[in-house]
Amino acid sequence: MSEAYFRVESGALGPEENFLSLDDILMSHEKLPVRTETAMPRLGAFFLERSAGAETDNAVPQGSKLELPLWLAKGLFDNKRRILSVELPKIYQEGWRTVFSADPNVVDLHKMGPHFYGFGSQLLHFDSPENADISQSLLQTFIGRFRRIMDSSQNAYNEDTSALVARLDEMERGLFQIGQNGLNDFQCWEKGQASQITASNLVQNYKKRKFTDMED
């Protein structure tokens, strides 16, 4: 049976999300703590909670602390106009970066943020003085966890991996699944259950170009 949804690759590790990707859509709706640096007229009804029996002013006052979806915070952020400033989520602050540098494998990334790497990469958009430390922490965390993830995916044939997978960020889960698929394909090949072997796309494209050159 064909899949109802053709998976589109995430673009969150680049400068912009890919809004044809369900992973990026979900990631862009995660909340980001911000502080307004100027009053925001006529938006109080949208962003401020009403207290019992009180009416909400039409403006969001300067200095208000809000939690906005990532996509909205990115749209409102402007270095020149200083509409809002961003507060780093705890998982990306120095305390947690120290934990990651000590042993990144002890952290349940999915519990802390299911799109840890993608969301962290998008934080670099806000020109924080900690951007260099954040990017380095993201890279070193990924490197520190990658080997264990792939080793587990290659040595867990027909085993229960739910406890391990439950602790992985969404991107890590994708890598784990790729490793599992490769292992399953290899096991099928060893047992003679593989389908007909075909040339890779790279080889086929090379042959097509070579044939075209010969015709010319």
From Swiss-Prot:
<dbReference type="GO" id="GO:0000811">
    <property type="term" value="C:GINS complex"/>
</dbReference>
<keyword id="KW-0158">Chromosome</keyword>
<dbReference type="GO" id="GO:1902975">
    <property type="term" value="P:mitotic DNA replication initiation"/>
</dbReference>
<dbReference type="Pfam" id="PF22466">
    <property type="entry name" value="PSF3_N"/>
</dbReference>
<comment type="subunit">
    <text>Component of the GINS complex which is a heterotetramer of GINS1, GINS2, GINS3 and GINS4. Forms a stable subcomplex with GINS2. GINS complex interacts with DNA primase in vitro. Component of the CMG helicase complex, a hexameric ring of related MCM2-7 subunits stabilized by CDC45 and the tetrameric GINS complex.</text>
</comment>
<dbReference type="Pfam" id="PF05916">
    <property type="entry name" value="Sld5"/>
</dbReference>
<dbReference type="InterPro" id="IPR021151">
    <property type="entry name" value="GINS_A"/>
</dbReference>
<keyword id="KW-0539">Nucleus</keyword>
<dbReference type="InterPro" id="IPR055221">
    <property type="entry name" value="PSF3_N"/>
</dbReference>
<dbReference type="InterPro" id="IPR038437">
    <property type="entry name" value="GINS_Psf3_sf"/>
</dbReference>
<dbReference type="GO" id="GO:0071162">
    <property type="term" value="C:CMG complex"/>
</dbReference>
<dbReference type="InterPro" id="IPR010492">
    <property type="entry name" value="GINS_Psf3"/>
</dbReference>
<protein>
    <recommendedName>
        <fullName>DNA replication complex GINS protein PSF3</fullName>
    </recommendedName>
</protein>
<feature type="region of interest" description="Not essential for folding and stability of GINS complex, but may regulate accessibility to the central complex pore">
    <location>
        <begin position="1"/>
        <end position="16"/>
    </location>
</feature>
<keyword id="KW-0235">DNA replication</keyword>
<dbReference type="InterPro" id="IPR036224">
    <property type="entry name" value="GINS_bundle-like_dom_sf"/>
</dbReference>
<comment type="similarity">
    <text>Belongs to the GINS3/PSF3 family.</text>
</comment>
<comment type="function">
    <text>Required for correct functioning of the GINS complex, a complex that plays an essential role in the initiation of DNA replication, and progression of DNA replication forks. GINS complex is a core component of CDC45-MCM-GINS (CMG) helicase, the molecular machine that unwinds template DNA during replication, and around which the replisome is built.</text>
</comment>
